[in-house]
């Protein structure tokens, strides 16, 4: 079973901001961000429980996966009832803190 992807407004904004920066600063790997996001979305729709539970646990029980090549975390939640994964945040690992969710 393949789950649907829903992207929160916050995550969509964070992805747009990262993509804008990436295209302006990563000329040699301009497609890396888009490619890694596409792979991550495919992975979490096919294996929604693959991500580690975020630390500390938050009220929406988010999970996260690390995109090694681009050094970003993708935070998401799983709704088995609607067979949906909702992307909650796209957060660079160097920030050191956890993102705030909608």
Task: List the predicted regions and their residue ranges.
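Enriched for short, Lys/Arg-rich terminal
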Residues: 67-102
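Basic, Lys/Arg-enriched alpha-helical interface segments
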Residues: 1-62, 80-82, 98-102
């Amino acid at each position: 079973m393949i789950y649907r992807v829903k992207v929160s407004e916050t995550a969509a904004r964070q992805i747009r901001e990262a993509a804008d920066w990436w295209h302006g600063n990563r000329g040699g790997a301009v497609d890396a961000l888009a490619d890694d996001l596409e792979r991550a979305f495919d992975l979490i729709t096919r294996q929604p429980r693959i991500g580690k539970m975020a630390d500390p646990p938050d009220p929406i029980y988010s999970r996260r996966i690390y995109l090694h090549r681009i050094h970003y975390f993708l935070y998401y939640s799983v709704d088995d009832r609607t067979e949906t994964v909702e992307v909650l945040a796209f957060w660079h690992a160097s920030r050191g803190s956890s993102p705030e969710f909608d």
